[in-house]
Amino acid sequence: MNNSEQLIALKESETAFLKYFNKADYELVDFSVVEKLDWKQLNHEDLQQMGERNFWQHEHQIYAIRNDFTDQLLRYYSMYPTAATKVAYTGLIIRNNEAAVQVGLENYAPSLANVQQSLKLFIQFIQQQLRDNVYFVVLGHYQLLDALLDKSLQTPDILSMIEERNLSGLVTYLSTEHPIVQILKENTQQQLNVLEHYIPNDHPALVELKIWERWLHTQGYKDIHLDITAQPPRSYYTGLFIQCHFAENESRVLTGGYYKGSIEGFGLGLTL
């Protein structure tokens, strides 16, 4: 496929995504890639993000290039509430001076059934339009870390070692028998079963993970991995997250996660 054909295919995929989810009764939204920001309303995390964003000042006003759709929509709907419970979008994101086209969905005040239906529809779109299918799924939950590791041990060094799966370092700091070490020693496909030995069966994170595992099995997905190493990109990501990896295009990943800040939601996004 030459450059012109790739460009046409990309634009067709964007349009097809909007048509597909318009037909499924999602509200289509189109926001400017340039965000107008108010310094007084930016929190510590917003300021930290500026390292990967292009921003400038003009006549006492700050402008920044969009780097995250969920974040932009959350900020906008916090100021201008919407009655929509499910929205679909396409457009550019720019991170660290690299541009990409993203398509995605947001479920507001989400129920489990609505989120799972959104994921099901998203995968069907990928199968039909992008001619690809889910190869394996990664599940995780941002409450697991607190369930497995005492707050006093959640130092930058230890968190970094967990993220890097540095078992030798973790053994030194935590001990061989520590739950995190024991879980990370297992194959990621087995870790969800092993997790049950280290946190109560009624822990909300474990309950939610098992519900999703069972649902994914009913959808025909058996290759499911647990990730206990991921740390939330923003503090409002407090619950379950999912990554669907694909068979044909290994670099393409459908990602999703629950968040609760000024708005509660569950977002799903795919970079084309």
UniProtKB/Swiss-Prot annotation:
The pathway is: Amino-acid biosynthesis; L-histidine biosynthesis; L-histidine from 5-phospho-alpha-D-ribose 1-diphosphate: step 1/9
BP-aspect Gene Ontology terms: L-histidine biosynthetic process
GO molecular function terms listed in the Swiss-Prot or TrEMBL record: catalytic activity, acting on a protein; transferase activity
Nucleotidyltransferase among keywords? no
Query: Which cell locations does it reside in?
Result: Cytoplasm
Gene3D superfamilies on file = Bira Bifunctional Protein, Domain 2
Pfam families referenced in this protein's UniProt entry, alphabetically: tRNA-synt_His
- Print the keywords alphabetically: Amino-acid biosynthesis, Cytoplasm, Histidine biosynthesis
Principal subcellular localisation of the protein: cytoplasm
Add the further remark from the entry. Answer: This function is generally fulfilled by the C-terminal part of HisG, which is missing in some bacteria such as this one.
Q: What does this protein do?
A: Required for the first step of histidine biosynthesis. May allow the feedback regulation of ATP phosphoribosyltransferase activity by histidine.
Family membership, please give it: Belongs to the class-II aminoacyl-tRNA synthetase family. HisZ subfamily.
Q: What is this protein called?
A: ATP phosphoribosyltransferase regulatory subunit
Look up and give the organism this protein is from: Staphylococcus aureus (strain bovine RF122 / ET3-1)
Instruction: Give the gene symbol.
Output: hisZ
